[in-house]
A protein has these predicted regions:
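A generic "structured core" feature
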Residues: 36, 49-50, 57, 64-66, ...
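Short, locally clustered residues in the helix-turn-helix/winged-helix DNA-binding domain
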Residues: 42, 87, 117, 162, ...
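An amphipathic alpha-helical interaction segment
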Residues: 86, 107-180
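Double-stranded beta-helix
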Residues: 90-111
Length: 213
């Protein structure tokens, strides 16, 4: 009686969640480790090394580093890039989908990454903009459910990517131009407001520009 639902992707430990702006001349010596890591470019461009391969990633590009793959990242010297870097443990076969692939994120996936960063600020007692930080201590009292939401958003992010690239949907041009229903737009506006509020709360001690918001 009842069903035990199957998890297609099961996450273990979270090792790092970072969002930071590199200097335009930043250079990292590289590393390898026995867990997954991905790098997503939110602004600018970077030169990423995967094993012996070099690739220039631009805004919206996403690259996965499989366990034990040597990798590093360097700014190109032109634009100071903003990056999301998340590393985590996962042993599911579904993760082989990401081997040696460079992907482009869509708006849903971009929002999921933003949600992960927001929840990380709610539960980790450290800065998220230190690329060399290896230990992420938890706050003594974090927001209820923040740790679980990180896991859920990250699972959603990975599943959404696999689904979208495995079964691409081509929408008719007419549908693409159709204005969103008012109910949908209202929900979207509320979500944007909440996200801006969260951002401002996490930057109370810094000068925030309109472009950043």
């Amino acid at each position: 009686y009842g069903l035990n639902l199957h998890d297609s992707i099961t996450l273990g430990r979270i090792f790092s969640i970072h969002y930071f702006e590199y200097m335009s001349d930043f250079s990292f010596e590289g590393e390898s480790h026995n867990f997954w890591e991905f790098v997503c470019v939110d602004k600018g461009e970077v030169d990423v090394t995967r094993g012996k391969n070099h690739t220039i990633l631009k805004k919206g590009d996403l690259v996965f580093h499989k366990p034990n793959e040597f990798h590093n990242v360097n700014a190109t010297g032109h634009i100071a890039p903003n990056l999301v870097v998340i590393s985590f443990e996962c042993h599911d076969d579904a993760m082989y989908f990401f081997n040696d692939r460079i992907l482009r994120i869509d708006e849903t996936e971009r929002n999921l990454l933003a949600d992960i960063i927001i929840e990380a600020r709610r539960c980790f007692d450290c800065r998220l903009d230190d690329p060399y930080l290896q230990n992420m201590p938890l706050k003594d009292s974090d927001v209820f459910g923040a740790q679980q939401m990180i896991k859920l958003y990250l699972q959603h992010f990975l599943i959404h990517l696999i689904r979208r690239y495995s079964n691409p949907v081509v929408l008719p041009k007419k549908l693409l131009k159709t204005e969103a229903p008012k109910a949908t737009k209202s929900k979207s506006d509320a979500e944007v407001f909440n996200r801006v509020t969260d951002y401002l709360e996490s930057h109370l001690t810094t000068h925030v520009t309109i472009d950043q918001i």
